[in-house]
Amino acid sequence: MLLLRHRFLLFFMTVLFAVKPVEAASCLGDKSSQSSYSVYLVPRISATKLYQEWAPFLERLGMENGLCFVLRIPADFTEFEEAIQTGKPDFVLLNPYHQLTVVRKPGYVPLVRDENSELSGLLVVRKDSPLKNIQQLNGTAVAFPSPNAYAATLLIKALLAQKNVHVTANYVGSHSNVYRAVALGAQQAGGGANTTLDHEPKELQSQLRILFVTPEFMPHPFSAHPRIPQKVREKVITGFLSIANDPSGRAMLKSIQLAQPIRADYARDYKKLEKLKLERFSVRGSD
């Protein structure tokens, strides 16, 4: 147990000192473009991995549509949430809860989403954990990535509350941190999402067992600030759809979890989530 704690502390010291914002050093796409547009991503997994997945796609999207993108990955959830609330991103990949919170002010408009890949929250435990059901978590502590993470925190908290299961939340900074904390035995259970667990190394996945899965909901939309001209928004939408038409493009889109992009519509795709009243479980100024 002491060895596990030591390894856990070393891991989080590494994460603490490694965390910093990631920004593309130069334009991704058409470098002759007179305008550049920022693209923000929520730091659900490591910034390095996000950059490796998104930079090639944005380079192609920009080159094919005469656009220049600057990729920005905030250091943590709090910085990301502050950015979207103040309208800093021109374009941003939002979790569905964040889309609810910014659809009116600053007014972010969902442009595209994946057609088939739906999002589920997960509660994971170690593979050898004695826990068999979520009722056994009542009165215990559970790891979550951040207060306002959509599938990994808010959906799980809402559904646990419906079942009269009350837990104390330990926020550890990211989905990746949750999985590692549980695997190392530092946390008995943790909240994540199907889309992020699938990104983890097979060796780590093999150490975990899924205890609970939420119903599926719409995945993250790629959204635009209302200041972006309609002509530019349309270029981005048609660019996504066009890239999906060839094998190399589909591989890029699959890596960013938008394998089959379609036009998104707030009223059709996300307004229904308002009925869940997830704000009861959110923490203002966090995520």
Where are these regions (language model features)?
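N-terminal hydrophobic or amphipathic helices and topogenic motifs
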Residues: L2-L4, F12, A18-E79, Q85-G87, ...
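Periplasmic-binding protein-like
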Residues: Q34-R44, N116-V125, E203-A244, K254-E279
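Sec-exported extracytoplasmic/periplasmic mature domains
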Residues: G62-G66, Q85, A161, V165, ...
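Short helices/loops that flank or line small-molecule/ion binding pockets
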Residues: T78-V92, K105-P106, Q135, S176-G191, ...
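Short loop/helix-cap segments at secondary-structure boundaries that form the rim of catalytic
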Residues: T101-K105, E200-E203
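A structural signal for short loop-to-beta-strand junctions that line the ligand-binding cleft
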Residues: P106-E115, L211
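Pocket-lining segment of extracytoplasmic ligand-binding domains
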Residues: S129, N138-K231, T238
